[in-house]
C-alpha cells in the first residue's frame, strides 16, 4: 500500500487505444452516470481533473427523437481519435466513450489539477 500525503491522491487515468493519455480524474468512469442516448460516461468538469486532449471541430448530430445537438470533438493529442465530446448546449460536461479509453489507477499531485 502506498503512503499518500495531503498533496496527492488516488486517481484514474484514461488512455486512448493508441496509448496516449487522454484524461485523469479522481473517480472511476464506472462510478459516474451514463448518458442514455449513447451510454457515454458523463464527467462534470467541476470534478478535479487533468485534461490531456485537444478540442476539435463542432458538428451536428440528428437524434432519434427528431431533435439535434451540436457537439464539440475532444480528440486524442497523438492520433486525433474522438474519445469524448462536449455539448454546445450543456457546457461544463465531458461525455467519454467507455469503449475507447483504457483505465489505469494512478497517484496524482494536487498541484497538477485544474480548479
Curated annotation (Swiss-Prot):
GO terms for cellular component: endoplasmic reticulum. Belongs to the STEEP1 family. It comes from the Eukaryota. This is ER exit protein. GO terms for biological process: endoplasmic reticulum to Golgi vesicle-mediated transport. May stimulate membrane curvature formation and subsequent endoplasmic reticulum exit site (ERES) establishment. InterPro entries: STEEP-like. Disulfide bonds: none annotated.
Amino acid at each position: 500500500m502506498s503512503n499518500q500525503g495531503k498533496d496527492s491522491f488516488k486517481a484514474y487515468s484514461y488512455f486512448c487505444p493508441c496509448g496516449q493519455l487522454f484524461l485523469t480524474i479522481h473517480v472511476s468512469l464506472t462510478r459516474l452516470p451514463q448518458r442514455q442516448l449513447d451510454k457515454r460516461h458523463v464527467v462534470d468538469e467541476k470534478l478535479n481533473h487533468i485534461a490531456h486532449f485537444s478540442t476539435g471541430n463542432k458538428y451536428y448530430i440528428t437524434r432519434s427523437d427528431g431533435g439535434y445537438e451540436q457537439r464539440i470533438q475532444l480528440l486524442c493529442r497523438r492520433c486525433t481519435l474522438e474519445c469524448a465530446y462536449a455539448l454546445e448546449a450543456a457546457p461544463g460536461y465531458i461525455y467519454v466513450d467507455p469503449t475507447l479509453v483504457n483505465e489505469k489507477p494512478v497517484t496524482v499531485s494536487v498541484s497538477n489539477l485544474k480548479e
